[in-house]
Amino acid sequence: MMSSRTRKIYLFVFMFISTSLQLMNGEAKAEPETFRQFLYNKQKGTVLGRTGTSWCQITVFYIIFYIFLSAFFIGCLAIFLKTLDPKVPRFYGKGTIIGVNPGVGYQPWLKENPDSTLIKFNLQDSKSWEPYVKQLDGYFSRYNNTNDTRECGAEDSNEALQTDPDSLPCRFDLGLFEKANCGAKDQYGFKSGKPCVVVSLNRLIGWRPVDYDGNSVPEEIKSRYKSGSITINCEGATPFDKEHLGKVKYIPEAGIDGRYYPYVFLPSYQQPIAMVKFDTIPRNKLVIVECRAYASNIEHDVSTRIGMVYFELFVEDKKPVAAPAA
């Protein structure tokens, strides 16, 4: 069997003889092509190394190739989109980024100052509390559209929304807030110095409150707790705040009505809420308020503020300072 070294010797001899024969026959060695000739070679009729026919062939090839590639991509995308439900995330619940513990939010929250949790106004200056009233007007305006909703009695709920595509969500009644002087006609209590704050839960697909078992109801809500509801409890964040917060009224007293759950992604869905009225909030003192939502499946963590929300109340009662003359 021929070794590798022997093959290399034979190859060298063959190349040497071939080169010698070319020189003996007067054949000149081909000159290297210059860059200018590469761009355009007049003798060969090429541009960038290709003739016109070659350029046409490769252009047609890539057009057909990318058409098929695009069609394949669009087909795969269409098949993937068919597997998605526009109303429900593919993954939700425990172990997902959405999670199972709803967050707590509040209104009014001024969009002009989104990083601030301070609700501050002066009783003697209507311009200071009007922005909060307008914010709440805009927030409640979403409940004015009652199309594709239904009136629900005490025994009705949104339970069928997940299984029956023809079921309509329950219409949320704002009348209980008006009766408690926390409606638009009372400027949500801001004009009288008894501000009403909306407390709500974040929308979690499929989430519903779980009742406490027997004697497991927390002591702070035991007198107001009602089966099927998410009870809201607000108190001062520090001993100073607890001392000065004053009387707090909850509307409704049991908190957010659980029959409006579970939440589903429908344009006509009306989110259930509760309002907290601060009847005797002190004047000219800053009070930090902590509001918690209570149900058996709502956890609380002060460090991450899970299941709770914080905001500050500062109600002034003094003559506004006149702006200096220009």
Curated annotation (Swiss-Prot):
Lumenal topology ranges: 81-326
GO cellular component entries: sodium:potassium-exchanging ATPase complex
Membrane-spanning intervals of the chain: 60-80
Secretion signal, residue range per the UniProt entry: none
One GO MF term: ATPase activator activity
Subunit structure of this chain's protein: The sodium/potassium-transporting ATPase is composed of a catalytic alpha subunit, an auxiliary non-catalytic beta subunit and an additional regulatory subunit.
Name of the protein this chain belongs to: Probable sodium/potassium-transporting ATPase subunit beta-3
